[in-house]
């Protein structure tokens, strides 16, 4: 900050007693207009005094002022002029999108309220005492179609939604049971802190801008009482992964790895992006901080910070540009706060989505009074296989690393069986089985890697996954043939997991490596083992055993349906506890756990009539959330009306003032012109459901764009899928909007009826699909293009601006792109021609 701004901030803090962080937020929200910020401060204190504890109750050396003592401070208000600099404009832009950005002052009070509830990271207590909160979107179905589409593309991470739904990972349960609510990913800033942003959005509705969660995460890893237990769980899982790839760490290397994990969680920025970098909210900024990206272990630690389970919905494989899977994605699954007693934890899980190296919060939408839909999150995939339970094994303080790791007896004593995992889920969450109608069927998930089955965690503990399969495939009578079959199956699984682990370690090198890996290890990659249910190739003895067990379980399901839950739940397992499922210690689990085990086994054999889900508790909104949403909706309506007005102005410029008739470039559309024109009300909806995803970075804003360039921050760059590309293909990173106003009239890039590729007829500045692909780069300037006239459309002529040597086009009134932009700017400065005041 400059000296003047320091002085303004000091005066504001001295006159109000506000915390410096809150004072800065208020001043920045009003462009450093002190009078306006003071007015905001007084209004908020009076409105929210009964609901929010004063955010400046501690940590400030300035005396507190009475709640309604605004008149006492009136004479001390500074009479400085409004100060503004480029950084403040950037901050204002950054706070101009999304529900939490509608009123920075309200959110600042709420953030301060949250942070004031936290304790010291080094105390015996948890860094934060979290109330049970779950944010819900307002009911958008009450609004008109065009306005609803505008809000959806502003608030919802459309590309992530489409990608995960098409991959069969998200909302597949809605198609199986219409009483379940759809979950939607909220648009989240991609600055390296997206995990904590997503968690904060999912609970409170605003980003973790003050890094409250990140600081708590770091404190718990560095000096929390659970530090050593968390480290053992991490080292155990990492050791199993290292075994698969043949890696052996020394003690120094283990310490270095652990220190690196802690360092990643630090709240210190990694770097500052330049003017062409990707920053939160799509704003070019030289001061926007970027933080280190976090790993799956940090999700596990976050569950302990929040004292609540976390469920991450993600695809299981990373795919190259051709849709080929070449590396596993380890994030998907369940993270339980296992080092906190279940009685002290919230039982409603926080649900996050992960796609293309980016986290988002998954939230439901408010319902009408008459609606009976329930908010749930399945704990299995669409094939009824239990999701990975991450970092569930703690070998204990007495574990001798390097020695006990190779002792099969010791290993067998700590591997978790399916029964143990179900017991943990019942302990930490409110779970239930949702019955399905006879004709319902889950959409198939995307094809896995040639190695892994749908729910297997490629980087999770191999023994844990094998234990699941063992519990399902083995008879309750402990048949020897079944055990032999399981041993041979484990050998095959080990070979497959080895290939997966190698792909995981090296997969980031891209498509070429993935192709070579699969080519050179084809024997391993394509030798698929039996399904997780244990059905498939095997000895005659095991087949007979499976048939017997299958019949018994069918009877179990029928009796449960008839209401005899107690007898049916204990039936198949009460004859003899499953001794081959090690890790249960011989203890008998509750009736509910045994019922879940029986139903899970049946479901995993392809006869599932139920979905195993955790219930999501949706509490009442806090008053600050209600006001935050109402202000956002009012702000969104303003922007929507301004956008409609701008489209009308552009249409007049294009059709009335500059172009005498329909643009000739629109004529050769091969599909009968199915696309809507740019001013059609259907456009927001079409843009809202694009595919692919630009990753965890923000796409730079092209210069000179009008409101049509102001698409949501993480909108799809590549547009809808065309040609024969699969829906999960990764597209080049491009800006989603139209970089120049004339791009509305670009012909389709598919070959026309005459076989000529229409995009090839256009000069480079008019080619959208292949004009630029790097998300960090501004679109290339077209002004220097000087192609030969023989390649131009017949109507293209020299720019009509005197002394300009470039070519124009009828759609730009025969002006080159540079002169055309200058003409638009000139028109905007005329009365009635101003553009939107809001910029994303």
From Swiss-Prot:
Residues 65-77, 456-471, 488-500 have a biased composition (Basic and acidic residues). The active site is at residues 191, 194, 358. Residues 183-365 form the OTU domain. Disruption phenotype: No visible phenotype in neonates. Mice do not show obvious defects in survival, except a moderately reduced body weight. They however display hyperactivation of non-canonical NF-kappa-B without affecting canonical NF-kappa-B activation. Mice show B-cell hyper-responsiveness to antigens, lymphoid follicular hyperplasia in the intestinal mucosa and elevated host-defense ability against an intestinal bacterial pathogen, Citrobacter rodentium. Residues 167-440 are annotated as: Catalytic. Residues 440-452 have a biased composition (Polar residues). Residues 187-193 are annotated as: Regulatory loop. Its EC number is 3.4.19.12. The modification Phosphoserine is found at residues 100, 464, 467, 471. Residues 152-401 are annotated as: TRAF-binding. One of its GO terms (cellular component) is cytoplasm. A motif (Nuclear localization signal) lies at residues 483-498. GO terms for molecular function: cysteine-type deubiquitinase activity; cysteine-type peptidase activity; DNA binding; K48-linked deubiquitinase activity; K63-linked polyubiquitin modification-dependent protein binding; zinc ion binding. Negative regulator of the non-canonical NF-kappa-B pathway that acts by mediating deubiquitination of TRAF3, an inhibitor of the NF-kappa-B pathway, thereby acting as a negative regulator of B-cell responses. In response to non-canonical NF-kappa-B stimuli, deubiquitinates 'Lys-48'-linked polyubiquitin chains of TRAF3, preventing TRAF3 proteolysis and over-activation of non-canonical NF-kappa-B. Negatively regulates mucosal immunity against infections. Deubiquitinates ZAP70, and thereby regulates T cell receptor (TCR) signaling that leads to the activation of NF-kappa-B. Interacts with TRAF6. Interacts with PARK7, leading to inhibit deubiquitinase activity. Interacts with EGFR, ITCH and NEDD4. Interacts with TRAF3. Interacts with ZAP70 in activated T cells, but not in resting T cells. This is OTU domain-containing protein 7B. The lineage of its organism: Eukaryota, Metazoa, Chordata, Craniata, Vertebrata.
